[in-house]
Structure formats: C-alpha cells, structure tokens
Amino acid sequence: MLQVEQLHQYYGGSHILRGLSFEATVGEVTCLLGRNGVGKTTLLKCLMGLVPAKEGKVSWEGKAITASRPHQRVQAGIAYVPQGREIFPRLTVEENLLMGLSRFSAKEAKEVPGFIYELFPVLLEMKHRRGGDLSGGQQQQLAIGRALASRPRLLILDEPTEGIQPSVIKEIGAVIRKLAARGDMSILLVEQFYDFAAELADQYLVMARGEIVQQGRGADMEAEGVRGLVAI
C-alpha cells in the first residue's frame, strides 16, 4: 500500500501541495482528478523522488521512502509513466521495452516478458519499428508496457488518455482493468477525462488548489458531484 501523510511542496513563494494525505490500496485503481494547475503532476514527481517533498511522509509497503532517490523507488517496485510518455524515439519498440528491465540483472533483462505483448499486441507487431515512428496512442501503449516490464507493484500513470484516439483509450482502459483484477498491484491514475476515470476508479480523490477537497468510492462519483468539480 502507498501511504501519503501531510505532504507539502513549494515552488518559490507558492505553496503547491498543501498537506495531502491519502492511501492507494493493492488491487485497486485510485483515480486522482483535478483541473489543470492544481498540483497533480507535482504530487507524482514527489512520489517518485524527482522533486523532494518539503514536509510530510511517503510510505510504500510499510517503509518510509520520503528520502529515497528515484532509482531506489524503482527498485522498490514503483513505476511511473509521465505525461508526454518520454519514450526513446530512436530506439526500437523492443529496445524501449528492454529499458524497462533495467532494475533486473543482465541475465533477467535479456528478453521482453511475454505478458507485455499479450496486453499490447500492437507492440509485438511493431517491435522492430522505431519508437518515434509510432502514433501517439501506440507510444502511450509503449510507455505503459515499458513501465510494466519492471514488474511494478505500484503503477503511477499521469493522464494516459491525453491526445489519444478513442479506440486506444478503450484498449488502455481494458489493460488497467486487467492489471487491477490481478490483485497484486496498486494503480494511481491521474486523469482529467472524467468518464474514463469514473469507469475505472475503485477510489477517487479530487484536488483543488493543492489540496484534496473530496474523496470517496468510485461507484459514488456521479452521485457525489465529482463531474462538476473537475469540469473545465
């Protein structure tokens, strides 16, 4: 389980994250929603150690990781797919996926795990193509596949539907559902597309002005007025 307690972060004189506390449970999709500029991506960077938290505590599987470096969090079983995907455009699909195995020994990191291609068949079809030649939706699938290659127990996704065609959004949603159903992974999904989040969320969190202003069970999102809270 991921536990975040009273997390604060500042940029210059701006108080970006204001005492955030929440949990992301194994076997569930926790959806974090909010309008642009409320601090969602900053929160994820703090969770990955890319931006150090000024105050508060982050714990993973019962151990404090607040001071851990990004590579130590990866070694602990956390994977992050940032906004913008950040694949390696000059490497092939297969080479990109192999990069996700960097936390394993050389012996274990020789071959792309078959389950990645089962989840994303298009990556098998295009494994010899350069990442930069793929469509935006295919690049997003590649970025998620690369993260999954590390066999994470916590998967963090930052707006995976942004700029993606509807057919690929459906495919990504189906993969997230499959991963959650396995029951051995926590999934933290940051999303602005309300319908996508509502379809997947076991738990939801709504951020505004650097704070979590509402939270609850995914099944209650419509009844609890979440759509109106995140409407642009």
Summary of predicted features, one role per range:
Residues 33-35:
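The feature captures the beta-strand-to-loop junction immediately N-terminal to the Walker
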Residues 48:
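Helix-to-loop junction immediately C-terminal to a conserved catalytic motif
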Residues 56-64, 76, 109-115, 214:
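Conserved ABC transporter NBD signature motif
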Residues 147-148:
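ABC ATPase C-loop
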